[in-house]
From Swiss-Prot:
Residues 6-244 form the ABC transporter domain. Signal peptide: none annotated. It comes from Rhodopseudomonas palustris (strain HaA2). The keyword Transmembrane helix applies. The gene is macB. The keyword Electron transport does not apply. It holds the Pfam family ABC_tran. One of its GO terms (biological process) is response to antibiotic. This is Macrolide export ATP-binding/permease protein MacB. It is a multi-pass membrane protein.
Amino acid sequence: MAGSTIELRGLRREFPSGEATVVALQDLDLTIEPGEMVAIMGASGSGKSTLMNILGCLDRPTSGSYRIAGRETSSLEADELSALRREHFGFIFQRYHLLPALSALGNVEIPAIYAGQPGEARRARAGELLARLGLADRSGHRPNQLSGGQQQRVSIARALMNGADVILADEPTGALDQRSGTEVLQILDELNRDGKTVIIVTHDASVAARAKRVIELRDGVVVADRLTSPEAARRAGDAPTRQPPATPRWNWRREYDRISEATRIAVLAMAAHRLRSFLTMLGIIIGIASVVFVVAVGDAAKRKVLADISSLGTNTIEIFPGKDMGDVRSSKIKTLVAADARALAQQPYIDGVTPTVSTTSTLRYGGLEANALVNGVGDQYFDVKGTKLASGRFFDASGLRDIVQDVVIDEKTRQTFFADVAGGAVGKVILIGKVPCRIVGVMQQQQSGFGSNQNLSVYLPYTTVQARFLGNSSLRSILLKVSDTVATADAEQDVTRFLTLRHRVKDFVILNTDDIRKTITSTTGTLTLMIAAIAVISLVVGGIGVMNIMLVSVSERVGEIGVRMAVGARRSDILQQFLIEAVVVCLIGGGLGVGVAFGLAALFNLVVPMFPLSLSGTSIAAAFVCSTGIGIVFGYLPARQASFLDPLAALSRD
């Protein structure tokens, strides 16, 4: 079976024109053997261009049969026709149809990209073809830097890139001067001598005279089919035959090359419309920056809240007199006493216990005085609260027993009374009300939060405060540290049962810091989610902007799509091309959005140093995942529209 024989039998092509039908080709019977050089002539409207489009698998006949290498084309799917165009045919167009964003070398490479040739081999062959056609020194030039003749030679090199054995030339000299036209025809002669089947569509008799066989059309009918040289009859069929290739199997390297090329084209397309690309990205930039920044603020707020809660102590519960929080009669309930604390200390689920009492008084030292909160606490208070000392020591159990007048002061008190005192505060005697107390320790500074306030605070043994300041034995509260092996909720239930039995009535209320932590963490998370959801709206708006611009890009690049399909791009290749472009736009926008979020976080940290923000790797990774997802979701419709364009219609609109 002749691998390259072209056979037309009863071929007919009709086009609708309003309510009428225009017949472009009528019942053509035609055979073109391998190695022939054929000119198809005819006046405008004779059907010669329609015939060439059908021969090149850019169009389908209305009826009849078109067989290439014995294979009926009417039954082939779109991708199978793409494979024929990619490997079997080479197109030379009157208007060149070179992609303006690519160099001469890049234009020649295009068919090989879709054929899956490796990058190095592809570039080497493209360079060889350009050198063969006298364009070695112009391989890096773009089409607008080349003359018409040079552009047509680039088009010829592109047609030869995949080793096509049928060259279809549509008015190859129509846009050239005489000299350039002659050079192009000489190249076609050489290709024919090399065994290529060359089919030239022309209305110029002098061009047709270069062919060995001339087919003349009139009103869609062959009116003449003659040989111009006896040699042509002998040479026809002598060319090596070749079976049309099957669609290549999937190969990861070929796919990588295609994706790399699509990414490069995407960047070039963006560079060609910088302002439009930036405005397209703006919605993505704002959306990603908002989401990442809001998540960072939410995380920082959560950390701050948890740190403030920790100032109440870790895994702690606190017992207050009263039937519930806010009980107005709680001050009259005197049943919460130190004996309760000692009894609770014996329970296995408790790691530490401290009674607490409090009052206010005036501090005096060296002519200075200030009001302060006087806290009476147990010797385990500082461990339960996780408090650390800047200097000195805490008082111990013997101090409670002996009702010592030792005091631990906070950092605010030190700054107020002892900032300029030589030797510091430890060891000095400060007057609290009328009671002289020796300073034994200074606490580290604590951030303001749940466990602190702006008042000065001092800490004495609770027995001392009861005896010297209050004159009674009741407690303000009992603070418990729950064992790490016990859930605070379980401990709370056990303490409730224990004290209820001990008091014979529930005259106390328990504050569980773990409940506070959970509530505030949940609230913070909800607020963060709500604000992030608002920020996501801008992402959706940005995605719609990407879709709109991609639709505009498709409409502007219809000609490019037609060229890519003509040289063998499958629908999936076109879909992939525009999807990748949408994803690249969104990824760059996402990267810029993350950069903006970093800038906002840095500015925020300068303005509010007590509330530091840090961007998490998770939120950044999520930002890029969102960017990719937006590109795919909102880029799919334009990409699909591009992939379903008819190659002939796309070329005609260029």
